[in-house]
Protein backbone atom coordinates (compact mmCIF):
# COMPACT_ATOMS: atom_id res chain seq x y z
CA UNK A 1 0.00 0.00 0.00
CA UNK A 2 2.77 2.36 0.98
CA UNK A 3 4.59 1.63 -2.29
CA UNK A 4 1.40 2.32 -4.27
CA UNK A 5 0.95 5.70 -2.59
CA UNK A 6 4.59 6.57 -3.28
CA UNK A 7 4.22 5.58 -6.95
CA UNK A 8 1.06 7.68 -7.32
CA UNK A 9 2.80 10.65 -5.71
CA UNK A 10 5.73 10.42 -8.12
CA UNK A 11 3.38 10.16 -11.12
CA UNK A 12 1.49 13.20 -9.87
CA UNK A 13 4.69 15.21 -9.58
CA UNK A 14 5.73 14.22 -13.09
CA UNK A 15 2.36 15.26 -14.53
CA UNK A 16 2.49 18.55 -12.65
CA UNK A 17 6.06 19.20 -13.79
CA UNK A 18 5.13 18.40 -17.39
CA UNK A 19 2.17 20.77 -17.30
CA UNK A 20 4.27 23.50 -15.71
CA UNK A 21 6.97 23.18 -18.40
CA UNK A 22 4.35 23.55 -21.11
CA UNK A 23 2.87 26.61 -19.45
CA UNK A 24 6.27 28.30 -19.10
CA UNK A 25 7.16 28.10 -22.81
CA UNK A 26 7.30 31.64 -24.24
CA UNK A 27 5.04 32.59 -27.11
CA UNK A 28 6.41 34.69 -29.91
CA UNK A 29 5.70 35.40 -33.56
CA UNK A 30 8.38 35.31 -36.24
CA UNK A 31 8.39 38.46 -38.43
CA UNK A 32 7.76 37.94 -42.12
CA UNK A 33 9.92 40.90 -43.14
CA UNK A 34 12.90 42.71 -41.60
CA UNK A 35 14.18 46.28 -41.74
CA UNK A 36 17.96 46.69 -41.72
CA UNK A 37 18.17 50.46 -42.21
CA UNK A 38 19.56 51.12 -38.73
CA UNK A 39 22.01 48.20 -38.70
CA UNK A 40 25.52 49.47 -37.96
CA UNK A 41 28.35 46.99 -38.42
CA UNK A 42 31.04 49.63 -38.99
CA UNK A 43 33.37 48.75 -36.09
CA UNK A 44 33.54 45.03 -36.80
CA UNK A 45 33.53 45.56 -40.58
CA UNK A 46 36.56 47.83 -40.30
CA UNK A 47 38.44 45.19 -38.34
CA UNK A 48 37.55 42.56 -40.96
CA UNK A 49 38.93 44.87 -43.66
CA UNK A 50 42.10 45.50 -41.68
CA UNK A 51 42.73 41.77 -41.41
CA UNK A 52 42.07 41.39 -45.14
CA UNK A 53 44.76 43.98 -45.97
CA UNK A 54 47.29 42.42 -43.62
CA UNK A 55 46.60 38.99 -45.06
CA UNK A 56 46.95 40.32 -48.61
CA UNK A 57 50.31 41.87 -47.69
CA UNK A 58 51.68 38.52 -46.48
CA UNK A 59 50.25 36.82 -49.56
CA UNK A 60 52.47 38.99 -51.80
CA UNK A 61 55.21 36.48 -50.97
CA UNK A 62 53.10 33.58 -52.29
CA UNK A 63 54.55 33.67 -55.78
CA UNK A 64 56.97 31.59 -57.83
CA UNK A 65 58.15 34.52 -59.93
CA UNK A 66 58.62 37.30 -57.40
CA UNK A 67 60.15 37.45 -53.94
CA UNK A 68 59.13 40.59 -52.05
CA UNK A 69 60.63 40.94 -48.59
CA UNK A 70 58.12 41.70 -45.86
CA UNK A 71 58.56 44.56 -43.41
CA UNK A 72 57.97 43.69 -39.74
CA UNK A 73 57.45 47.33 -38.79
CA UNK A 74 54.75 47.69 -41.42
CA UNK A 75 52.94 44.59 -40.15
CA UNK A 76 53.09 45.87 -36.57
CA UNK A 77 51.92 49.33 -37.62
CA UNK A 78 48.98 47.80 -39.46
CA UNK A 79 48.17 45.68 -36.42
CA UNK A 80 48.16 48.79 -34.19
CA UNK A 81 46.77 51.06 -36.94
CA UNK A 82 49.46 53.73 -36.74
CA UNK A 83 51.39 55.67 -39.42
CA UNK A 84 48.70 55.23 -42.12
CA UNK A 85 49.82 51.84 -43.39
CA UNK A 86 46.52 50.75 -44.91
CA UNK A 87 45.69 51.40 -48.53
CA UNK A 88 42.19 52.47 -47.49
CA UNK A 89 42.17 55.87 -45.74
CA UNK A 90 38.90 54.94 -44.03
CA UNK A 91 40.80 52.29 -42.08
CA UNK A 92 43.69 54.62 -41.28
CA UNK A 93 41.37 57.32 -39.93
CA UNK A 94 38.92 55.04 -38.12
CA UNK A 95 40.54 55.15 -34.68
CA UNK A 96 40.07 51.37 -34.59
CA UNK A 97 42.78 48.73 -34.40
CA UNK A 98 43.19 44.97 -34.17
CA UNK A 99 45.72 44.73 -31.35
CA UNK A 100 43.66 46.21 -28.52
CA UNK A 101 40.87 43.64 -28.99
CA UNK A 102 43.03 40.58 -29.63
CA UNK A 103 42.87 38.09 -26.78
CA UNK A 104 46.18 36.92 -25.38
CA UNK A 105 44.68 33.61 -24.24
CA UNK A 106 47.32 30.88 -24.52
CA UNK A 107 49.81 33.65 -25.33
CA UNK A 108 48.40 34.11 -28.84
CA UNK A 109 48.85 37.87 -29.14
CA UNK A 110 52.50 37.61 -28.11
CA UNK A 111 53.01 34.69 -30.51
CA UNK A 112 51.43 36.64 -33.35
CA UNK A 113 53.67 39.66 -32.84
CA UNK A 114 56.74 37.43 -32.81
CA UNK A 115 55.58 35.87 -36.07
CA UNK A 116 55.82 39.27 -37.78
CA UNK A 117 59.59 39.28 -37.21
CA UNK A 118 59.87 35.59 -38.10
CA UNK A 119 58.07 36.23 -41.40
CA UNK A 120 60.74 38.75 -42.39
CA UNK A 121 63.45 36.12 -41.96
CA UNK A 122 61.39 33.65 -43.99
CA UNK A 123 60.79 36.15 -46.79
CA UNK A 124 64.52 36.94 -46.91
CA UNK A 125 65.29 33.24 -47.23
CA UNK A 126 62.68 32.94 -49.98
CA UNK A 127 64.17 35.88 -51.87
CA UNK A 128 67.44 34.03 -52.43
CA UNK A 129 65.80 31.52 -54.78
CA UNK A 130 62.26 32.78 -55.49
CA UNK A 131 61.39 29.96 -57.87
CA UNK A 132 62.49 27.15 -55.55
CA UNK A 133 61.46 25.74 -52.19
CA UNK A 134 63.63 27.29 -49.50
CA UNK A 135 61.75 25.98 -46.45
CA UNK A 136 62.70 22.73 -44.75
CA UNK A 137 62.45 21.16 -41.32
CA UNK A 138 63.80 23.73 -38.87
CA UNK A 139 64.21 26.35 -41.61
CA UNK A 140 61.67 29.05 -42.48
CA UNK A 141 61.11 30.10 -46.07
CA UNK A 142 58.97 29.46 -49.14
CA UNK A 143 57.27 26.11 -49.57
CA UNK A 144 56.21 25.04 -53.05
CA UNK A 145 53.55 22.34 -53.09
CA UNK A 146 51.92 21.67 -56.43
CA UNK A 147 50.59 25.04 -57.56
CA UNK A 148 50.81 26.55 -54.07
CA UNK A 149 53.64 28.86 -53.06
CA UNK A 150 53.44 29.75 -49.39
CA UNK A 151 55.63 31.34 -46.74
CA UNK A 152 56.06 29.06 -43.72
CA UNK A 153 57.97 29.05 -40.45
CA UNK A 154 60.56 26.51 -39.33
CA UNK A 155 57.77 24.10 -38.30
CA UNK A 156 55.98 24.38 -41.64
CA UNK A 157 53.19 26.60 -40.29
CA UNK A 158 51.92 29.20 -42.76
CA UNK A 159 52.33 32.80 -41.57
CA UNK A 160 49.15 33.88 -43.32
CA UNK A 161 47.18 31.24 -41.46
CA UNK A 162 48.65 32.23 -38.09
CA UNK A 163 47.44 35.78 -38.71
CA UNK A 164 44.12 35.09 -40.42
CA UNK A 165 42.83 32.10 -38.46
CA UNK A 166 44.34 33.39 -35.25
CA UNK A 167 42.55 36.74 -35.46
CA UNK A 168 39.33 34.97 -36.43
CA UNK A 169 39.46 33.15 -33.11
CA UNK A 170 41.31 35.48 -30.74
CA UNK A 171 39.48 38.61 -31.87
CA UNK A 172 36.38 38.05 -34.03
CA UNK A 173 35.00 35.06 -32.13
CA UNK A 174 36.27 36.19 -28.72
CA UNK A 175 34.92 39.73 -29.05
CA UNK A 176 31.54 38.65 -30.43
CA UNK A 177 30.99 36.21 -27.57
CA UNK A 178 32.21 38.75 -25.01
CA UNK A 179 29.64 41.26 -26.27
CA UNK A 180 26.82 38.72 -26.32
CA UNK A 181 27.68 37.42 -22.85
CA UNK A 182 27.26 40.95 -21.46
CA UNK A 183 24.45 42.12 -23.76
CA UNK A 184 22.07 42.80 -20.86
CA UNK A 185 24.49 45.37 -19.45
CA UNK A 186 23.98 47.66 -22.46
CA UNK A 187 21.31 50.36 -22.34
CA UNK A 188 18.26 49.44 -24.40
CA UNK A 189 16.09 52.48 -23.63
CA UNK A 190 17.81 55.57 -25.01
CA UNK A 191 17.91 55.84 -28.79
CA UNK A 192 21.07 57.53 -30.11
CA UNK A 193 21.58 57.97 -33.85
CA UNK A 194 18.81 55.50 -34.66
CA UNK A 195 19.70 52.71 -32.24
CA UNK A 196 20.14 51.95 -28.55
CA UNK A 197 23.51 50.92 -27.14
CA UNK A 198 22.25 47.34 -26.90
CA UNK A 199 21.09 47.32 -30.52
CA UNK A 200 24.48 48.63 -31.63
CA UNK A 201 26.21 45.95 -29.53
CA UNK A 202 24.13 43.25 -31.24
CA UNK A 203 25.12 44.72 -34.62
CA UNK A 204 28.81 44.78 -33.73
CA UNK A 205 28.77 41.17 -32.54
CA UNK A 206 26.92 40.09 -35.70
CA UNK A 207 29.42 42.01 -37.84
CA UNK A 208 32.25 39.74 -36.71
CA UNK A 209 30.44 36.87 -38.45
CA UNK A 210 31.51 38.38 -41.79
CA UNK A 211 28.19 38.28 -43.65
CA UNK A 212 25.75 40.90 -45.05
CA UNK A 213 23.08 42.28 -42.72
CA UNK A 214 20.40 40.40 -44.68
CA UNK A 215 22.19 37.04 -44.60
CA UNK A 216 21.33 34.31 -45.59
CA UNK A 217 19.03 35.86 -48.21
CA UNK A 218 22.06 37.79 -49.41
CA UNK A 219 25.26 35.75 -49.52
CA UNK A 220 27.56 38.14 -51.37
CA UNK A 221 30.90 39.19 -49.96
CA UNK A 222 31.15 36.49 -47.30
CA UNK A 223 34.34 36.85 -45.25
CA UNK A 224 36.22 34.86 -42.63
CA UNK A 225 33.72 32.90 -40.49
CA UNK A 226 30.95 33.71 -42.95
CA UNK A 227 32.78 31.97 -45.79
CA UNK A 228 32.69 28.57 -44.07
Label every PLM stretch briefly:
Residues 15-18:
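C-terminal motif of bacterial Sec signal peptides marking the signal peptidase cleavage site
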Residues 23-228:
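Mature extracytoplasmic or organellar-lumen-exposed domains after removal of signal/transit peptides
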Amino acid sequence: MRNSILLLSICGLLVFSSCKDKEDKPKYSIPQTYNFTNANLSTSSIRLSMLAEMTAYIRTTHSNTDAPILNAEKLMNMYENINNMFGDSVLNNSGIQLKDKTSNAFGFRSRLELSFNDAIIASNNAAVKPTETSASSGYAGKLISGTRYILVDSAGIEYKEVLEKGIMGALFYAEATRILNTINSYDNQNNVNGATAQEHAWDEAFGYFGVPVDFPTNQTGLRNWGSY
